Amino acid sequence: MAFKDTFNKMISYFDTDEVNEVEEDVTASTDNVIPRSQQSVRASSHPKQEPRNNHVQQDHQARSQEQTRSQMHPKHGTSERYYQQSQPKEGHEMVDRRKRMSTSGIANRREQYQQSTCSDQTTIALKYPRKYEDAQEIVDLLIVNECVLIDFQFMLDAQARRCLDFIDGASKVLYGSLQKVGSSMYLLAPSNVSVNIEEMTIPHTTQDIGFDFDMKRR
């Protein structure tokens, strides 16, 4: 019995070694098979995905290129239409501006010329006083810078002398000048008018002897 047991143990020992070797061979073969199958699956999946990705990238690049071209080079039709529409408007606006500037410039020149002529013009008023109250009207003309040519032929000697004294005093106050230009005529000028009278001999007749007032005192 003891010998039989030892024989069975030896048989079982060798049997387990064979089983282990078989199991190791099976596991190694399975390990080698699984990576090959995974590699085949991966290799088969990559060729399918790469064309799709390339196609998407090409579409995206084509769209981006079209957008950049459209931004850099706009359509000729729209630009020409805009130029044709904007060109007449700009031309009309320039013409209107030039007309306005020319008319305004002419108006300003006219106003300046009128103002200069009005300021440069000197009016000479001819007065024939008949009474003493007319002297105030003559002085009022001197205040507004007008020259007055006074003829006393219609006044008496006493009235003409009083009137002449009043006008002479007013001319001094207003910085004017009073000069005799005839036997019975005197020129009253404002300060901005200079009068140059040449000396001349005035003939004295019986009609105007009384009007040669005390002007020689001046």
UniProtKB/Swiss-Prot annotation:
Domain of life from the UniProt record: Bacteria
Main location as per UniProt: cytoplasm
HAMAP family from the UniProt entry: SepF
Polar residues bias locations: 28-43
GO terms for biological process, alphabetical: division septum assembly; FtsZ-dependent cytokinesis
Family: Belongs to the SepF family.
Complex formation: Homodimer. Interacts with FtsZ.
InterPro entries: Cell_div_SepF (IPR023052), Cell_div_SepF/SepF-rel (IPR007561), SepF-like_sf (IPR038594)
GO cellular component terms, A-Z: cytoplasm
Compositional bias per record (Basic and acidic residues), positions renumbered to this chain: 47-63
Source organism per UniProt: Streptococcus pyogenes serotype M4 (strain MGAS10750)
Annotated spans, Disordered: 24-115
Database matches in Pfam families: SepF
Protein name from the UniProt record: Cell division protein SepF
